[in-house]
Each structure stands twice: as C-alpha cells, then as structure tokens.
C-alpha cells in the first residue's frame, strides 16, 4: 500500500468520539433576528448534473483565530451534502484543516503528498495526492508546517504568485467548488491563493479589534485585483463566534453591517463547543453533531452562497 493510500485509510476510520447529549448552545442566528433586517430564505439547491469549471474560493483574514478553518471545512461539507463536488486546500503552515479532517501524528508531519510538496515538485500532479474525507463528495489536499518557509523559498521565482493557479488548473473540471483555507498573513501564500481564486469569503469574529483589521484585508484584495487577478470578487463577510448573550457581539455586527451593508452574509455563525469537539474527532461538525446549531448555520450558509452566485 502506497503512502497516499495509507493516509486515506487512516482518515476514513470512524471516530469513537460522540457529542454530549442535550447540548446548551447558541441557536441559529441571522441578521434578521439579530439586527431586525428582513428575513431572507434560501431554497434547497438542486444537484448539479456533472462537475466542472469549479469556482475557486479563498477563505481569508489576516487575523488568526477568526474561524477560517472552521468555515472552510464545514462550508465544504455542507456544499457536499447538497451534491457539490468539493476540494479543500490546506494552505496554512499550521495545517489545522488537515487535523480537522482526521490526519494526525506521523501522517501530519509527512511532507510527501502535501500542498508544500506539490508546490516544490514541478513533476508532481495534484490529482495524484487528493484525499477523500469521511463526507462523500468532500476531498482535500493536506497542509504542512513547511509552508511557513514559502516566503524565502519562492523569493527569486518568476511569476511566483501564479504557482497555485497552475497547480489547480488540471482539476477545475472535476469539482464544483474549491475552497482554500489561507494562512493569517498577506505574504506569498495568500497572494497565491487570491490570484487563483474567483471569490473571497472573509470570516470575521464579532469582536471590535477584528473590525480594525477588515480594511487591511480589503486593501490586500484590491491590490490583487489591480495586479494579478482583476476578476476577484468579495463574496461576503461572515460574522463568526457570535454570542447572543453579549451586547458587544451585537454592537460589532451592527458596525460591520453599517460599514459594508451589501457584503455581510445574512447567516451568522454562533460560538459553540461543537466546532472544537468536531476538530478533535477529525470530522466536520455536520457529521459529528448533525442536528446542532453549528451544522444548521453552515448548511444555511451553503444555500446562501449558492443563491448569491458564489457557488453553483
């Protein structure tokens, strides 16, 4: 059995962790019930007849700990549930997405088959190293800690900002959506991800200091549009880690919605222990705690993204 096959078999092993019963958690939140905006409903999307011409979406914020990885994994899983063929790319040296999908220990540290390996081996083909998650229709490429060296490794390369775009090109006709979990920086990796993408989702914690960094993210996106990818679009700002019981969360959400009224997703992601529990279990929250508010929120976000045209 080859290395790739061994990693896949480890991944698909069922977790023994189970969610606790009768969880006390936030209910599903939207801008309608939190801010009093008009309620928007999104119909269940029809399945696409065949994959192809994938929409590439970067999940970006230059601040860490705002829910990028949680969003990439669980939005991807929710899209797969409605028949979309989804590929996740772990583009962060912390490899949190890889861990959240069940790869741990020695397999996590192995460079061979990771996105870092693919970026550095011109003869390697991305399609040869795609791993299957426990969710049908949800595939992924592992991250690796050596991604932290990208800035120095690619400094002298010509057209270095196009490396990921070229790597993804052969698999665009095999998927409907490709989600890239970006590193919390505005360096070479993020530039590569944005250059390869059609759209951007910006998760933003409902905390005041997170608002201050939002303008920096938007400036980075504007620079990419001016220099390497004029078609790049902001698909939406996603409020995360919302706590209904605190006035601060509501005040921050009001501020974001006032500043960017056309860009804020109607769906809000509330804070819940289910997200951290599902990461430990190595599966998306939609599989770990299917009836939880976290699962419901990401399923609603998937419908909203499709309705907005961000995904087909």
PLM feature spans:
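P-loop NTP-binding core
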Residues: 1-312
């Amino acid at each position: 059995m080859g290395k790739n096959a061994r990693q896949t078999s480890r991944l698909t092993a069922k977790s023994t962790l189970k969610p606790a019963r009768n969880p006390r958690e936030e209910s599903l939140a939207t801008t309608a019930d939190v801010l009093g905006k008009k309620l928007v409903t999104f119909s269940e999307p029809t399945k696409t007849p065949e994959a192809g011409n994938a929409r590439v979406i970067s999940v970006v914020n230059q601040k860490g700990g705002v829910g990028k990885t949680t969003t990439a994994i669980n939005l991807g899983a929710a899209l797969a549930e409605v028949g979309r063929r989804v590929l996740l790319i772990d583009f962060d040296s912390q490899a949190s997405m890889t861990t959240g999908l069940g790869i741990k220990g020695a397999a996590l540290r192995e460079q061979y088959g990771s996105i870092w390996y693919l970026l550095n081996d011109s003869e390697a083909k991305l399609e040869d190293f795609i791993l299957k998650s426990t969710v049908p229709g949800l595939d992924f490429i592992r991250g690796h800690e050596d991604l932290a060296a990208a800035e120095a490794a690619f400094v002298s390369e010509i057209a270095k900002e196009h490396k990921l775009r070229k790597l993804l090109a052969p698999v665009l006709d095999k998927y409907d959506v490709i989600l890239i979990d970006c590193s919390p920086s505005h360096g070479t990796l993020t530039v590569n991800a944005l250059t390869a993408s059609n759209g951007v989702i910006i998760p933003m914690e409902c905390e005041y200091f997170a608002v201050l960094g939002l303008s920096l993210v938007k400036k980075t996106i504007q620079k990419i549009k001016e220099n390497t990818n004029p078609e790049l679009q902001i698909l939406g700002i996603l409020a995360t880690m919302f706590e209904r019981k605190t006035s601060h969360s509501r005040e921050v959400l009001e501020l974001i919605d006032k500043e960017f009224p056309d860009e804020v997703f109607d769906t809000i992601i509330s804070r819940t222990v289910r997200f951290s529990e599902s990461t430990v279990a190595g599966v998306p929250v939609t599989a770990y705690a299917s009836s939880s508010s976290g699962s419901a929120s990401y399923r609603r976000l998937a419908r909203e993204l499709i309705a907005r045209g961000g995904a087909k």
